[in-house]
């Protein structure tokens, strides 16, 4: 039958595995080298191979997949280490050689491949997925499965999109091109100055003169006693450098030469000028004239601005909050002024600071007087030192005098100078007094000490440098007594509007602040005021007002769950913070809460009611975070209530491929494991990619392992899992009859030897499993090892489960005790069992029996081979369909029309589930090899019957010879009557007779011995056939039909759920 499949979508896989004529193919050299070898393939994505071309060769990558060098660069051949050194075992290799001799290394921690010697360039490539491709051709015989490492891009080739796809690359960019970040303007200026300096240094005579000029200038600057003196030296130096450079033809042609010389001189003299200016203006600096630190506590309302009008009715706290935010932004920018080492850099800081302070807020523009006051406030709060030195430098060392006297820069410097001039003794004394009062009030509130009523009443509008009002200070310090006093006795100063508008720099409302510091009493007071005094729309607006982290009140409700009943219905439970977390998600992650189960249950009930009241279905997808974590992933305990909701996806992986069960296994969430394992929708054997780990592989706690295995044991009598290297041995975990034990891999192979001895004609593929166990790990790649062991252990599960139904498994014993039990000799047969005389009619009957069964089982094997190939086709083509769909969506998402591109977003979900396909193929393979084992037994016994006929023929010939030579078999005459000749002849005859007699005896004995073997083997085979027929029917039902159908149904349910979630995302 033809051994190739319909064309595979991935060109590289199709070229290697699906060649109809390997002996005449362009890759025949590769096929001859790979004939009986074990290897793995690094396969770029199908999308890449179909959409890109190699710039150097001009060939499409799909065509390049039929060129030896490209293909061989993606194939790694592995030698079995046990062939040379029996005790050697590969654990994890990191360095590999491709088929054409190129070097690469695999970094398992971050799943990347790094190319090395032999490749034209060093590339770092991500491993996306690892799987095993079943062998379906007849020319690669090294293994039943080939490991496939799916990688993000090819290991070689200069990639550009195909011509017809260039339109997409122009819109979205070549995803394989190096994305260089645009340099900042400041970096560009620095580069120009450094390049200019390098040019000067490359001309020795110019470099010497320039160096001498700077050396002399620096010495004179150190001796200068006035700003004018420093400025004079600086100007003279600029002129000298300009003269030196203008006389040199190699430098005087440069563009913007004056600006370049200015920047260059500044670069060389900036530090010296700053040091000397500090000495000259030291006594004029604010920090030396006054107690500058005492001014830090100044409040915004204590400097004159148009945001605090005399008419209280026109006052807007919302505008003040916005202004405080602008001041804080400007403050952070002003603090960086000392880090700038250029005139333009410092001036840019001041200009940006002015721009931030001058922003129009809620229709209120900032006039000149307000701007000056805000700059004074900024200087007090920022505590930036050396401002007089900065002003002196900016006003005396400019590139041109007109640049700082007119325009925006002139206005900025004049305002800066006016702000510094504001600080004279009278104003400073006044500010200091106000700051002292502020600090006294705040300290009294924070320490819960008595506050002077008069002092408090005259400073009700003060705010800290963090933008906190008195109400906010009371809330954060848990001083609810003063808070109550303020709200009760100063209602006009703290009207409802101000309570609603009050925010700190994080834009958190007073209620959010109360929840953040767990001030339940304050939260209750505030919520009562809001619920009783506001309309429903105002309540919703306030409770859903986001802070700087885009979190609303609901994101903090776990801090005081008692508020939920009264305010829960007003929350927007689908609002997401800057991390993409909804309030429900945030509550589920509040692991430190003492009453966690109570909180999540109440909040979930409230959210379910909220969806019902809004006539909306519960939308699980919107409660996922950007990393793909669902509510099930993050819930620490109590998932019962979540599993009761419709449309919950219990198997959905996050962006790292981790399902909820894997998360529970990793973080020891035992109660969640016990609950979710009872859910019929669970696919407990899902594999994480690209690490290829199951939920059992993630366990580190024996209790967690036992919890999963106890639940699994209800479905499977024997569970084999988790190959790990411990105590210098490969060990596997086996769970049987409620007992978990770890056994070495060598002992399991010893166990299979025991089964082979005890059941020599068993139909189970014991020898195949022994070979698979022996070769585990030779690829040296952890993901491949886990995937190989996963499938091999599933086969061992079936074998041991069957043995468990026929007798004692002994798998609850310790390793040494089990080894003693398994150390049995070959069963001894009695003489009557070993030597049996069979008649030709019996042999004919056995041969007829064997030939009939051989023909029947060969038919069955052919059917299984065809069925397996069809299963492989279905598996591969299913992935091809998913790949094409995702490729289509990817291209659509790059469309230039945003409306069109948006329709392709958020739909590229992983709909492909390989478990049922792999299980179906694996189970068919197990049954096929069981049939092959029986066929081998038939052929072996047929060979013995042929040998029996040979010995039978020899025996008949010997009997014929005996009858011919000794027809009567009478006794010879006595020696007394014989002469010499008669005696000699009779002696020869006697010797011949004895020899023939011995040959007859030996031939008969051999025939009986073979007959005994045939008889015993025939009976064993007959029993084996009957057992296989019984096993086959049950196997069809349990492992071919029922389990696969059940698995496929559950998988399709997940696919449909993802479709529903996707549609919800686009509604």
UniProtKB/Swiss-Prot annotation:
One of its GO terms (molecular function) is guanyl-nucleotide exchange factor activity. InterPro entries: Ankyrin_rpt-contain_sf, UPF0507/Ank_repeat_27, VPS9, VPS9_dom_sf. One of its GO terms (cellular component) is plasma membrane. It comes from the Eukaryota. Disulfide bonds: none annotated. GO terms for biological process: early endosome to late endosome transport. Residues 280-432 form the VPS9 domain. Belongs to the UPF0507 family. This is UPF0507 protein KLLA0D01133g. It comes from Kluyveromyces lactis (strain ATCC 8585 / CBS 2359 / DSM 70799 / NBRC 1267 / NRRL Y-1140 / WM37).
């Amino acid at each position: 039958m033809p051994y190739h499949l319909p064309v595979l979508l991935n060109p590289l896989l199709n070229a290697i595995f699906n060649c109809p004529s390997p002996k005449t193919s362009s890759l025949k050299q590769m096929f001859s080298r790979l004939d009986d070898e074990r290897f793995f393939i690094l396969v770029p994505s199908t999308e890449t191979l179909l959409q890109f071309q190699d710039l150097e060769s001009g060939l499409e990558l799909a065509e390049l997949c039929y060129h030896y060098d490209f293909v061989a660069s993606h194939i790694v051949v592995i030698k079995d280490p046990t062939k040379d050194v029996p005790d050697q075992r590969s654990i994890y290799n990191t360095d590999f050689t491709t088929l054409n001799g190129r070097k690469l290394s695999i970094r398992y921690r971050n799943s990347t491949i790094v190319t090395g010697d032999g490749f034209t360039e060093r590339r770092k490539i991500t491993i996306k997925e690892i799987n095993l491709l079943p062998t379906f051709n007849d020319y690669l015989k090294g293994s039943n499965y080939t490991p496939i490492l799916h990688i993000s891009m090819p290991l070689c080739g200069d990639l550009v999109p195909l011509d017809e796809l260039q339109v997409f690359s122009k819109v979205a960019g070549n995803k394989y091109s190096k994305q260089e970040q645009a340099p900042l303007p400041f970096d560009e200026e620095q580069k120009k100055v450094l390049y200019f300096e390098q040019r000067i240094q490359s001309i020795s005579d110019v470099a010497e003169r320039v160096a001498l000029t700077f050396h002399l200038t620096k010495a004179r600057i150190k001796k200068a006693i006035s700003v004018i003196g420093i400025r004079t030296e600086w100007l003279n130096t600029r002129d000298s450098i300009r003269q030196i450079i203008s006389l040199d033809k190699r430098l005087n042609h440069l563009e913007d030469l004056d600006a370049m010389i200015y920047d260059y001189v500044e670069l060389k003299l900036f530090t010296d000028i700053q040091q000397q200016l500090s000495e000259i203006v030291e006594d004029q600096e604010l920090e030396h004239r006054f107690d500058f630190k005492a001014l830090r506590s100044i409040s915004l309302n204590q400097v004159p601005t148009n945001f605090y009008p005399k008419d209280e009715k026109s006052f807007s706290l919302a505008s003040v909050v916005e202004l405080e935010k602008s001041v804080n932004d400007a403050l952070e920018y002003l603090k960086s002024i000392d880090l700038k080492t250029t005139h333009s850099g410092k001036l840019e800081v001041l200009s940006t600071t002015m721009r931030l302070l001058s922003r129009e807020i809620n229709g209120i523009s900032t006039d000149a007087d307000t701007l000056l006051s805000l700059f004074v406030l900024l200087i007090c709060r920022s505590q930036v030192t050396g401002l007089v030195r900065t002003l002196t430098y900016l006003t005396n060392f400019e590139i041109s005098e007109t640049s700082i006297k007119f325009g925006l820069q002139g206005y900025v410097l004049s305002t800066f100078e006016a702000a510094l001039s504001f600080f004279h003794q009278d104003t400073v004394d006044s500010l200091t007094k106000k700051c002292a009062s502020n600090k006294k009030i705040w300290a009294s509130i924070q320490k819960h000490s008595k506050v002077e009523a008069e002092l408090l009443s005259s400073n009700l509008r003060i705010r800290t440098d963090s933008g906190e009002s008195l109400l906010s200070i009371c809330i954060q310090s848990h001083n609810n007594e003063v808070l109550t006093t303020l709200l009760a006795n100063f209602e006009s100063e703290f009207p409802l509007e101000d309570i609603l508008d009050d925010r700190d720099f994080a834009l958190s409302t007073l209620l959010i602040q109360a929840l953040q510091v767990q001030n339940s009493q304050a939260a209750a007071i505030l919520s009562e005021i809001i619920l009783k005094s506001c309309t429903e729309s105002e309540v919703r607006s306030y409770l859903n007002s986001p802070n700087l982290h885009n979190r609303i009140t609901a994101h903090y409700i776990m801090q005081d769950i008692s508020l939920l009943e009264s305010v829960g219905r007003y929350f927007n439970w689908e609002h997401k913070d800057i991390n993409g977390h909804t309030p429900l998600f945030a509550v589920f992650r509040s692991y430190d809460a003492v009453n966690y189960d109570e909180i999540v249950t109440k909040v979930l009930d409230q959210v379910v009611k909220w969806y019902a009241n809004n006539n909306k279905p519960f939308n699980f997808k919107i409660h996922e975070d950007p990393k793909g974590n669902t509510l099930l992933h993050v819930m620490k305990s109590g998932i019962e209530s979540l599993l009761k909701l419709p449309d919950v996806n219990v198997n959905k992986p996050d962006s790292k491929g981790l399902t909820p069960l894997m998360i529970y296994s990793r973080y020891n969430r035992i109660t969640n494991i016990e609950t979710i394992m009872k859910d019929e929708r669970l696919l407990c054997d899902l594999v994480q990619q690209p690490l290829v780990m199951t939920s059992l592989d993630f366990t580190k706690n024996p209790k967690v392992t036992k919890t999963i295995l106890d639940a699994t044991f209800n479905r499977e009598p024997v569970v084999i899992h988790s190959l790990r290297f411990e105590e210098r041995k490969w060990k596997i975990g086996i769970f049987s009859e409620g007992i978990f034990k770890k056994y070495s891999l060598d002992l399991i192979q010893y166990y299979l030897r025991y089964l082979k001895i005890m059941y020599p004609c068993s139909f189970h593929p014991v020898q195949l499993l022994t070979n698979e166990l022996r070769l585990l790990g030779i690829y040296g790649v952890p993901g491949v090892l886990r995937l190989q062991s996963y499938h091999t252990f599933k086969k061992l599960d079936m074998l041991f489960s069957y043995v468990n139904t026929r007798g004692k498994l002994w798998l609850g014993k310790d390793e040494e005790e089990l080894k003693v039990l398994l150390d049995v000799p070959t069963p001894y047969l009695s003489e009557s069992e070993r030597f049996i005389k069979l008649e030709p009619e019996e042999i004919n009957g056995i041969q007829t029996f064997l030939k009939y069964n051989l023909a029947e089982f060969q038919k069955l094997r052919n059917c299984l081979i065809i069925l397996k190939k069809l299963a492989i086709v279905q598996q591969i083509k299913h992935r091809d369909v998913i790949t094409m769909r995702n490729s289509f969506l990817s291209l659509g998402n790059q469309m230039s029309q945003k409306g069109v591109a948006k329709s392709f977003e958020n739909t590229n979900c992983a709909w492909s589930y390989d478990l049922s396909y792999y299980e179906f193929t694996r189970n068919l393979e197990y049954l096929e090899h069981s049939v092959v084992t029986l066929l081998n037994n038939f052929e072996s016994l047929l060979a013995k019957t042929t040998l029996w006929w040979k010995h039978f023929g020899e025996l008949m010939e010997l009997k014929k010879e005996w009858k011919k030579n000794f027809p009567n078999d009478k006794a010879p005459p006595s020696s007394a009557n014989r002469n010499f000749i008669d005696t000699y002849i009779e002696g020869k005859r006697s010797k011949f007779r004895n020899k023939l007699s011995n040959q007859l005896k030996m031939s008969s004995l051999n025939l009986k011995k073979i007959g005994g073997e045939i008889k015993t083997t025939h009976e064993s085979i007959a029993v084996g056939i009957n057992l296989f027929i019984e096993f086959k029917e049950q196997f069809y039902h349990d492992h071919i039909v029922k389990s696969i159908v059940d698995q496929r149904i559950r998988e399709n349910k997940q696919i449909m759920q993802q479709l529903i979630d996707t549609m919800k995302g686009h509604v």
